Amino acid sequence: MSIEQLAETAQAMVASGKGIIAIDESAGTIAKRFSSVGIENIEENRRAYRELLLTTPKLSDYISGAILFDETIRQSTKAGVPFPKYMADHGIIPGIKVDKGAYPLAGCPGELVTEGLDGLRARLEEYYKLGARFAKWRAVINIGDDIPSGMCIDANVHALARYAALCQEQGLVPMVEPEVIMDGNHDISAAYEVTEATLRSLFNALYEQNVVLEGTILKASMVIPGTDCEEQASIDEVAESTVMCLKSTVPAILPGIVFLSGGQTDAQSTAHLNAMNQLDPLPWPLSFSYGRAMQQAALKLWSQDMKGNFAKAQQVVYERAKENGLAALGKWKG
């Protein structure tokens, strides 16, 4: 695929007032989500739930793409239409999570490195044939006493850049996600410092490995205090700190940035995004790539009556998409 085609896909992913829904939960994660609302974790229930999300009427009004898990990209609607085809036919770009998860980084207690580079070229080639047009790889950066180390950041951004280069070789837009974890008692200045260091290293690694930024999307953490920090930040503080951090680290040529919700409540994730988009002018579109913050309310409703509440749960998904779509324009009223 040409650079022009990659750039076109990347720009479509961050189209004005649209974001990306993350439904790429691993088997273990979806098991926890289902268990929390009393749904049996079997393949048909997982398929039905993903169908609920992906076939929500008019979803493409506010959703440009969806990140799928390996199981989901191979599944179909009840009517037998493969999910990637259904999505493409309804204006939603299919994406695929390709990393194999984060594991302890040898020699660095309390730190993690994401695995999954082995065999990635062949997997990306297959995913492209299955209909995927972008991919996602998540790195995990913890904040604690004397962490993250430079070694941890370097190991993770090197893997992100290798993944990104392989994606572009195979015609997929790489979404690079260095998640700075909210867990901990660190304050907002510590979150800023770690996020800034991580993003500086990431874009240096992308440059060194010849990744074309015009065909790349950043999935970023907001700069936010740890969940156990006594001094929580206001909506405006989070918005201003996040935008300042991004402006100091992210090249303006990047097509756009989408945020992860990272354990924020539905209302927080939407309010923070909205406040950021009121801080004009911005060099790039700021939108969303939420998982829990898009799904949780709908999942709870669906669990109460999986047949009877199917359409009602889809309406909840649509409303959450609309709220976040408005926030991506700075027009959410709360």
Curated annotation (Swiss-Prot):
Keyword tags: Glycolysis, Lyase
Cited InterPro entries: Aldolase_I_AS, Aldolase_TIM, FBA_I
GO terms for MF: fructose-bisphosphate aldolase activity
Catalyzed reactions per annotation: beta-D-fructose 1,6-bisphosphate = D-glyceraldehyde 3-phosphate + dihydroxyacetone phosphate
One protein family per Pfam: Glycolytic
EC number, UniProt record: 4.1.2.13
Pathway in which this enzyme or protein is active: Carbohydrate degradation; glycolysis; D-glyceraldehyde 3-phosphate and glycerone phosphate from D-glucose: step 4/4
Domain of life: Bacteria
Gene Ontology process terms (BP): glycolytic process
Coiled-coil ranges per UniProt: none
UniProt similarity note: Belongs to the class I fructose-bisphosphate aldolase family.
PANTHER family found in the cross-reference section: FRUCTOSE-BISPHOSPHATE ALDOLASE (PTHR11627)
Protein name (Swiss-Prot/TrEMBL): Probable fructose-bisphosphate aldolase class 1
Organism: Xylella fastidiosa (strain 9a5c)
